[in-house]
Swiss-Prot record:
It comes from Treponema denticola (strain ATCC 35405 / DSM 14222 / CIP 103919 / JCM 8153 / KCTC 15104). Belongs to the CTP synthase family. ATP binds at residues 15-20, 72. This is CTP synthase. Pfam families: CTP_synth_N (PF06418), GATase (PF00117).
């Protein structure tokens, strides 16, 4: 089957859930037996999100091949279970950089470089390139921002041209917009959506499907009005009500007829979707048998999206154990003393310290790791959380004076965590240890029990590592190195032998978790937290 292209645009306001819609479309098509691939186009001028402030952008989702990408790629992977790559995330900055590099190399033979055709052609080449590289039946592209944004115009023009490149029968435009409900008059207002469609039409794009975000169900008269003013058949006007869980969204869209309409408009067989496992997962989420409290102690907790994949991985593990997860978002800066740690963490059945960069809030994380270690509370450290656990143990158990990380103190007396040799004297952007790396797991360890394997591969995003010069000082202690990278002998996993469940990893297991297939470490962490609550 020749690749078909679906483009998702947004209007009226941002943050309506284009990413979830794109992920849901991918899932509905895959559930019918078609192969899919999702990709995201962001109009910002940063080359990638790698150096962007988490408070502005949320988490950086890392692909298996080391791409630092938009968090929406996490939604795509979790919904479709299709591993994505660097080329599935494109920013305007990446597009312009490629064009300027080509121009400097004489690639345009001295010609004038312009937005049309050069920028639009570069965007089209990336869209079509995804189809060529993956061979997917459907290439689903989300266009960031809202229709009418100045920075998004080259992308809108590029997808307009794509329709004529691949043929109307192989291209579809899905437009997502808000239908506000005014309590005062008890009405859904369609005017903002009408103007959004009108704006899209002014750029030469006629949407094929309208997805309407609303708090209330659409009446027959509302559908008729939208159909009249948008040139879209009523059966292609899909309501998208606010769901209690994001994992209910594809089921709601399927019930609203989206899958059927997609197949009808593409003139392909509307196969029976296989959604039973997903439905069962959602039902389990809504009907837990127990509840536990997990304390997430981090640097960016004011914006939960900064830890989106961690939160979703915890939820998935909770679903596996039929357990509701109550997350305590704790700012590590607020933990300044042992008494603070006890006060903030007293209700936690398990503690997780996720990744981060810089020295802000580090003391609070050290006190958190110490509290978990000394009070036998299940602890899961990720990336920075692993480095914190090693430093805390060196300071308080091994009594290594002034143990620290050279990230926090370049002149640290005892840098238990240090910059990797090949990371010194390099620029910040694009220089981290990124993507999949192998790890050999020690026999009899908690990690081996979780993975049921002696060799794994996990995604990394870091510049600092455990300093192997200090390995001997940890020998014969309670902290063991249960996971090592075989190529460079780097410490990837640490555990405490006498602790019920204390595991910290240098990699990011959250990126590999799926709602109906939780990551083994998250699964066992939640089990340990459940047991901890029972045995208290």
């Amino acid at each position: 089957m020749k690749s078909k292209f679906i483009f998702i645009t947004g209007g009226v306001v941002s943050s309506l859930g284009k990413g979830l819609t794109a992920a849901s479309i991918g899932m509905l098509l895959k559930s019918r037996g078609y192969s899919v691939v999702n990709q995201k186009f962001d109009p910002y001028l940063n080359v990638d999100p790698g150096t962007m402030n988490p408070y502005q952008h949320g988490e950086v989702f890392v692909t298996e091949d080391g791409g630092e990408t938009d968090l929406d790629l996490g939604h795509y992977e979790r919904f479709t279970d299709v591993p994505l790559h660097k080329f599935n995330s494109t920013s305007a900055g990446k597009v312009y950089l490629a064009i300027l590099d080509r121009e400097r190399a004489g690639g345009y033979n001295g010609g004038t470089v312009q937005v049309v055709p050069h920028v639009t052609d570069e965007i089209q080449s990336r869209i079509l390139g995804t189809a060529e590289q993956t061979g997917a039946d459907f290439v689903i592209s989300e266009i960031g921002g809202t229709v009418g944004d100045i920075e998004a115009l080259p992308f809108i023009e590029a997808i307009r041209q794509i329709r004529y490149t691949v043929g109307k029968e192989n291209c579809m435009f899905v437009h997502l917009g808000l239908l506000p409900y005014l309590k005062e008059c008890g009405e859904i207002k369609t005017k903002p959506m009408q103007h959004s469609v009108k704006e899209l039409l002014s750029f030469g794009i006629q949407p094929d499907i309208l997805i309407c975000r609303s708090e209330k169900r659409l009446s027959k008269s509302t559908r008729e009005k939208l159909s009249l003013f948008s040139n879209i058949p009523q059966d292609a006007i899909i309501e998208n009500l606010t769901a209690k869980s994001i994992y209910e969204v594809p089921l709601m869209l399927e019930e609203a007829g989206l899958g059927k309409v997609l197949c009808k408009l593409f003139n392909i067989e509307n196969k029976e979707p296989n959604l039973e496992e997903w439905k069962k997962m959602v039902q389990t989420y809504y009907n837990p048998e127990k509840e536990i409290t997990i304390a997430l102690v981090g640097k960016y907790v004011e914006l939960p999206d900064a830890y989106l994949s961690v939160a979703e991985a915890l939820t998935a593990a909770g679903i596996y154990h039929k357990t509701s997860i109550k997350l305590l978002w704790i700012d590590s800066k607020k933990i300044e003393t042992k008494e603070d740690a006890a006060a903030f963490l007293k209700d936690a059945d398990g503690i997780i310290v996720p990744g981060g960069f810089g020295d802000r809030g580090i003391n609070g994380m050290l006190l958190t790791a110490q509290f978990a270690r000394e009070n036998k509370i299940p602890y899961f450290g990720i990336c920075l959380g692993m480095q914190i656990s090693a430093i805390e143990y060196a300071l308080n158990a091994l009594h290594i004076e002034e143990a620290n990380s050279s990230e926090f103190d370049k002149n640290a007396k005892n840098p238990v965590i240090d910059l990797m040799p090949d990371q010194k004297d390099v620029k910040i952007g694009g220089t981290l240890r990124l993507g999949l790396y192998r790890c050999m797991i020690a026999e009899g360890s908690l990690a081996e029990k979780a993975y049921k394997s002696h060799e794994i591969q996990e995604r990394h995003r870091h510049r600092y590592e455990f300093n192997n010069l200090y390995r001997e000082k940890f020998d014969n202690s309670d902290m063991i190195f249960s996971g090592l990278n075989p190529e460079r002998n780097l410490v990837e996993i640490v555990e405490l032998k006498s602790h019920p469940w204390f595991v910290a990893v240098q990699f990011h297991p959250e990126f590999a978790s799926r709602p109906n297939k939780p990551h083994p470490l998250f699964r066992d962490f939640i089990k340990a937290a459940v047991d901890n609550k029972i045995n208290r």
